[in-house]
Amino acid sequence: MSSSYINVIGAGLAGSEAAYQIAKRGIPVKLYEMRGVKSTPQHKTADFAELVCSNSLRGDALTNAVGLLKEEMRRLDSVILKSAEATRVPAGGALAVDREGFSQMVTELVTNHPLIEVIREEITEIPEDAITVIATGPLTSDALAEKIHALNGGDGFYFYDAAAPIIDVNTIDMTKVYLKSRYDKGEAAYLNAPMTKQEFMDFHDALVNAEEAPLNSFEKEKYFEGCMPIEVMAKRGIKTMLYGPMKPVGLEYPDDYQGPRDGEYKTPYAVVQLRQDNAAGSLYNIVGFQTHLKWGEQKRVFQMIPGLENAEFVRYGVMHRNSYMDSPNLLEQTFRSKKLPNLFFAGQMTGVEGYVESAASGLVAGINAARLFKGEEALVFPETTAIGSLPHYVTHADSKHFQPMNVNFGIIKELDGPRIRDKKERYEKIAERALQDLQPYLDK
């Protein structure tokens, strides 16, 4: 192809990463982003890589698969990880970021790159003038989504995703909550609102009977387990939340706790955790409380949480439909289209699930778009690495049962030899091997 540049459509986590990876390899990029001229119901700004759900990039330890993926991306010079490290906020053993500061830094680093031209306009056709990376995300505009679905034989996959409410910290009653990380991992980074059994039962009853906002679609509700609305979880059973976001283990009462408790128990019956959402520490989100309740119902029900009786919600929870492709049939392991060889896809639309995973797919697609431009061989990362196993999974899964996938040790190639029974030791060995196997790929 004679074109002198590569198109990247969408400046979310995947698109920003793809554009950066292409530009750092000396190739001009035209980066298209419609926000700024056309907004979406979920985005609040026109900044790149805006986080519309949680502000956490999840676990940071190498014994956690997403922690391993992040370390691999750091070594591959990821602009997303660079920005996350610079804007991190306390979150125990997790990597959480100042939501606005993070997006602003990504925007700045990408926009200021001399080889990246940012064009604020909506793209409604799949370009054929140059090698193109489509990274328009789960909130792809209808016009472009139709073209992508046509590639898929007209079958659009989808699932629903939700975001948790954010609260002004000054409106939390600090006498009813305590600062602690689960099992005291890292610094004490979460505010914990404990509940007695009766408080939990009353809360559960209110939650399952609260009125939900209507969906904008006639299609059947289908949720990704990692971002399930709290009310849907509650309806699965009275104790379901106690094994999920309201799990009390490792969150014992502090010695000076004076509030209500069940007898002499050292651990609450249930706990709601709040996590810092910005660097200033003025905003906190309710961890795991993604929701699609009507806003008035959110206020009524969530103010039943101890300490939140007078809480001011600076953002209510919202839900949106996420589209994803039939990647096993449509994409190569490099995220290159099998049908249109100059086209790459990246981000959640490929069936990777999660912020870090989306950025990782952008990194892989960007590197390979650049290599195609230069006439070089495709770069397929080994399945012994997190960044190699995830693209392999989404492009080799059973198409009939394909669902979005987070990175996890189950999709990374097993260690040779007898299985190590101790999980922590096994994961440490997998991580050690992954980083060794990644080494030869770092300068490509």
Curated annotation (Swiss-Prot):
<keyword id="KW-0808">Transferase</keyword>
<keyword id="KW-0489">Methyltransferase</keyword>
<comment type="similarity">
    <text>Belongs to the MnmG family. TrmFO subfamily.</text>
</comment>
<comment type="function">
    <text>Catalyzes the folate-dependent formation of 5-methyl-uridine at position 54 (M-5-U54) in all tRNAs.</text>
</comment>
<keyword id="KW-0963">Cytoplasm</keyword>
<dbReference type="GO" id="GO:0030488">
    <property type="term" value="P:tRNA methylation"/>
</dbReference>
<keyword id="KW-0521">NADP</keyword>
<dbReference type="InterPro" id="IPR002218">
    <property type="entry name" value="MnmG-rel"/>
</dbReference>
<dbReference type="GO" id="GO:0050660">
    <property type="term" value="F:flavin adenine dinucleotide binding"/>
</dbReference>
<keyword id="KW-0520">NAD</keyword>
<dbReference type="GO" id="GO:0002098">
    <property type="term" value="P:tRNA wobble uridine modification"/>
</dbReference>
<feature type="binding site">
    <location>
        <begin position="10"/>
        <end position="15"/>
    </location>
    <ligand>
        <name>FAD</name>
    </ligand>
</feature>
<dbReference type="InterPro" id="IPR020595">
    <property type="entry name" value="MnmG-rel_CS"/>
</dbReference>
<dbReference type="Pfam" id="PF01134">
    <property type="entry name" value="GIDA"/>
</dbReference>
<dbReference type="GO" id="GO:0047151">
    <property type="term" value="F:tRNA (uracil(54)-C5)-methyltransferase activity, 5,10-methylenetetrahydrofolate-dependent"/>
</dbReference>
<protein>
    <recommendedName>
        <fullName>Methylenetetrahydrofolate--tRNA-(uracil-5-)-methyltransferase TrmFO</fullName>
        <ecNumber>2.1.1.74</ecNumber>
    </recommendedName>
</protein>
<dbReference type="InterPro" id="IPR040131">
    <property type="entry name" value="MnmG_N"/>
</dbReference>
<keyword id="KW-0285">Flavoprotein</keyword>
<dbReference type="GO" id="GO:0005829">
    <property type="term" value="C:cytosol"/>
</dbReference>
<dbReference type="InterPro" id="IPR036188">
    <property type="entry name" value="FAD/NAD-bd_sf"/>
</dbReference>
<dbReference type="InterPro" id="IPR004417">
    <property type="entry name" value="TrmFO"/>
</dbReference>
<keyword id="KW-0819">tRNA processing</keyword>
<keyword id="KW-0274">FAD</keyword>
